[in-house]
Amino acid sequence: MFAELQRRRESGRVFEKHAFATLRDLFRWGMRGADGYQQLAETGYMLLAERTRHARDAETVRDVLQQVMRVHIDPEALYDRADTLAAQLGPERLAALQSAAQHHRIVWTSAMRRLVCLTAAALQQNEPVLLVGETGAGKTSVCDIVATAFGRPLH
């Protein structure tokens, strides 16, 4: 996986100069755990592709994951499936997030589900999270939901 991404980076200037997946990223991926290749590939996509700045780089990561692991990843449906969220977060944490979203009167758009899933999965592994985006994108709401669900303040 790492070797193929590295090869594509060198041949096509994918991931720009400094935005490439590091060994640290791969270790983080390994620490997340998975039940089968499909879940492993989806977790890898969440960790590697979602941090890219360009859609073509995310597509390259998806292509490599699908080629190496022989699975299919549908980024559009990835965060809309309850089984993906439950696998990433656990059924109890998913229920807590849904309850917190109702409490905060959040509408579960696909962008909001994606942001909540990525943020909660990182925090569950005690990984730092930096939310950057346009005003009104839902960053504060995501922090409120996740803080309520995890029962701890976020800074």
Regions found by a protein language model. Give the residues of each.
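Walker A/P-loop
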Residues: Q124, P128-H155
